[in-house]
């Protein structure tokens, strides 16, 4: 049992209120002006914000098969440090969770080593990237969160349509990395100013938006919940906006780096700035920000993609795609958008908690009496530089090295258990 004393919580209007919070038996038992500590532990939250634990539906934990990049343990330690209490792990592992047996093995490993809640995706196709569909029903029974072939787009419309029909029958979501392989052209960055300056092959916007346009029509026909991963282009935002207006059940996420950066920020041919989707144009970034504010884009997800140093500290042509994000998402977004008065604090918290929970019908993301005690304590005055040497993640690959941020998670509770406190994993 914990009593979080002298903290602040956000009310429904987005105003800060001074409150104590009682955690008992893994639940939020009481939120009140003052709670007397008669037993259990007192946690001093003076001057700090007590918020729901963050939810990230797009995380690469790499285990099994990629343990040199990340493990379930290190990835969930990174999540705890970043204030995340629920993360959803992508299936581009070896082996791929494309069968009941692999999924059950993965679930056992999660139970054994994870520091926070991990909800694993199953793949859509066998081995991830084939045209043979997995056994959707068996994988749902084994605990799959949803179905995705993240890392590659499902190339054949017929394959995707059949997958959507099967998912719809089980009330499960299809989550899509949208990329038409015939439109990538071997690109490593966005097909724009930076690619031209550096003489690099570029990935055009249509590689993403064309597949989203196809998929929203398939989702309408199948009656499926279709979720777009890491949306990055103005055309994609337009397609999703139109689909929502038409009543199609489509949701979308955006990553912190696509909100903060565009191609003009890239300092040179540095593998730590290579990600998929790539950093797009200023116009694309503006469309993403507009889409998030008007509800076209539903929430924020990191696409945490750790790699070993030798896979990133090379030119872009040779580097792996992806950057880490779990440990830096909140401070970056708070610094860039809340401190500059572009967003309210409540908007940011909602996009990292209740919005993803609502989209995927998860019973998390709220701080109220009776809710699961997934909690992050945030010091909104704390100032620190982003230093990969301090990361719990094995991946140190971030373009934000050295950036000064204000507003950091200082403690994280997962189902009432203190898993991170003042720089230490418990």
Swiss-Prot record:
Write down the Gene3D superfamilies for this protein, in alphabetical order.
Metal-dependent hydrolases (3.20.20.140), Urease, subunit C, domain 1 (2.30.40.10)
- Report the co-factor binding details: Binds 2 Zn(2+) ions per subunit.
The EC number(s) attached to this protein equal 3.5.2.3
Tell me one GO molecular function of this protein. Answer: dihydroorotase activity
Protein residues bound to substrate: 60-62, 92, 276, 307, 321-322
What are the annotated GO cellular component locations? cytoplasm
The cofactor named in the record is: Zn(2+)
- InterPro entries, A to Z: Amidohydro-rel (IPR006680), DHOase (IPR004722), DHOase/Allantoinase_Hydrolase (IPR050138), Dihydroorotase_CS (IPR002195), Metal-dep_hydrolase_composite (IPR011059), Metal_Hydrolase (IPR032466)
Any Gene Ontology biological process: purine nucleobase catabolic process
Q: Outline what the protein does.
A: Catalyzes the reversible cyclization of carbamoyl aspartate to dihydroorotate.
In its UniProt entry, what is this protein called?
Dihydroorotase
Starting at the broadest rank, the lineage of the source organism is:
Bacteria, Bacillati, Bacillota, Bacilli, Bacillales
């Amino acid at each position: 049992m914990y009593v979080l004393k002298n903290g602040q919580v956000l009310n429904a209007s987005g105003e800060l209120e001074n409150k104590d919070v009682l955690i008992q038996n893994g639940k939020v038992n009481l939120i009140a002006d003052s709670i007397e500590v008669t037993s259990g532990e007192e946690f001093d939250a003076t001057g700090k914000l007590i918020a729901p634990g963050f939810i990230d539906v797009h995380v690469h934990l790499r285990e099994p098969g990629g343990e040199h990049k990340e493990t379930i343990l290190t990835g969930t330690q990174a999540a705890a440090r970043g204030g995340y209490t629920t993360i959803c792990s992508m299936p581009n592992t070896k082996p791929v969770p494309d069968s009941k047996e692999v999924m059950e093995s993965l679930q056992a490993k999660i139970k054994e080593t994870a520091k926070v809640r991990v909800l694993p995706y199953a793949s859509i196709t066998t081995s991830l990237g084939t045209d043979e569909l997995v056994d959707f029903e068996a994988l749902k029974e084994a605990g799959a969160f949803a179905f995705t072939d993240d890392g590659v787009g499902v190339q054949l419309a017929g394959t995707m349509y059949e997958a959507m029909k099967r998912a719809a029958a089980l009330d499960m979501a299809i989550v899509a990395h949208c990329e038409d392989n015939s439109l990538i052209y071997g690109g490593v960055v966005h097909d724009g100013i930076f690619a031209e300056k550096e003489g690099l092959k570029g990935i055009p916007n249509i590689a993403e938006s064309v597949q989203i346009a196809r998929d929203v029509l398939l989702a309408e026909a199948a009656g499926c919940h279709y979720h777009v991963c890491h949306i990055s282009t103005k055309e994609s935002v337009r397609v999703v906006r139109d689909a929502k207006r038409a009543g199609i059940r489509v949701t979308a996420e955006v990553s912190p780096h696509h909100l903060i950066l565009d191609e003009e920020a890239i300092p040179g041919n540095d593998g730590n700035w290579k990600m998929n989707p790539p950093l797009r144009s200023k116009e694309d970034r503006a469309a993403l920000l507009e889409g998030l504010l008007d509800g076209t884009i539903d929430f924020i997800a990191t696409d945490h993609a750790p790699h070993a140093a030798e896979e990133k500290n090379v030119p872009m042509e040779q580097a792996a795609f992806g950057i880490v994000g779990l440990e830096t998402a909140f401070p970056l977004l708070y610094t860039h958008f809340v401190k500059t008065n572009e967003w309210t604090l409540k908007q940011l918290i909602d996009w990292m908690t209740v919005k993803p929970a609502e989209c995927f019908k998860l019973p998390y993301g709220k701080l109220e009496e009776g809710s699961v005690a997934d909690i992050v304590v945030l010091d909104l005055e704390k100032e620190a530089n982003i230093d990969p040497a301090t990361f719990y993640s094995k991946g140190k690959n971030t373009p934000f090295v050295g950036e000064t941020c204000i507003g950091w998670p200082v403690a994280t509770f997962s189902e009432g258990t203190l898993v991170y406190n003042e720089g230490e994993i418990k």
